């Protein structure tokens, strides 16, 4: 469960990072991406551990709120699942059609940008 939560927060952070304040960005980056402890972040910013914890929890709620309104991550996941189904179908029914593979690769590369 904790790993799933971390993956979700990291994904939401990737989508909505520009909407966060500099402090929110810093705390989440250090906590989730760089695996700092609350104490290490508190020392880095000369604040209490509780202040870091409160900021991270508040920012997680903000990210979830953005996702509830904008659905960027959910739609991204749905498109990726559909692309996977298309790729599987093409590979099983048209294994030698390089043009179809190239078209799917192009579509997937658009998502990565």
Swiss-Prot record:
It comes from the Bacteria. PANTHER family: UPF0122 PROTEIN CBO2450/CLC_2298, UPF0122 PROTEIN YLXM. Might take part in the signal recognition particle (SRP) pathway. This is inferred from the conservation of its genetic proximity to ftsY/ffh. May be a regulatory protein. The lineage of its organism: Bacteria, Bacillati, Bacillota, Bacilli, Lactobacillales. This is UPF0122 protein LAF_1235. Coiled coil: none annotated. Belongs to the UPF0122 family. It comes from Limosilactobacillus fermentum (strain NBRC 3956 / LMG 18251). InterPro entries: RNA_pol_sigma_r3/r4-like, UPF0122, UPF0122_fam_protein, WH-like_DNA-bd_sf. Pfam families: UPF0122. Gene3D superfamilies: Winged helix-like DNA-binding domain superfamily/Winged helix DNA-binding domain.
